[in-house]
């Protein structure tokens, strides 16, 4: 019975670790995506100030 109990505990620890890791990874991906969008907007804002860059990338620059 001791080996069965140890094996069961091992499986519970592995399962718990996997579930916690999966959920925390999802949260960090969401934060990374949000930060990435902010960086992208900042880069396009700089590009939109430059007339030549604005003309080449009109789809990213709002109409004035």
Swiss-Prot record:
Subcellular location: Secreted
Pfam families xref list: Toxin_8
A GO molecular-function descriptor: ion channel regulator activity
Keywords, in A-Z order: Acetylcholine receptor inhibiting toxin, Disulfide bond, Ion channel impairing toxin, Neurotoxin, Postsynaptic neurotoxin, Secreted, Signal, Toxin
Coiled coil regions, renumbered to chain: none
Propiece residue ranges: 22-41
Disulfide linkage: 47-53, 48-61
Keyword Secreted: yes
UniProt note: domains: The cysteine framework is I (CC-C-C). Alpha4/7 pattern.
Stated name of the protein: Alpha-conotoxin-like Lp1.8
């Amino acid at each position: 019975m001791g080996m069965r109990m140890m094996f069961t505990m091992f499986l519970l620890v592995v399962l718990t670790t996997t579930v916690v890791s999966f959920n925390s990874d999802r949260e960090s991906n969401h934060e990374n995506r949000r930060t990435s969008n902010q960086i992208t907007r900042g880069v396009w804002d700089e590009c939109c100030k430059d007339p030549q860059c604005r003309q080449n990338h009109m789809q990213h620059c709002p109409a004035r």
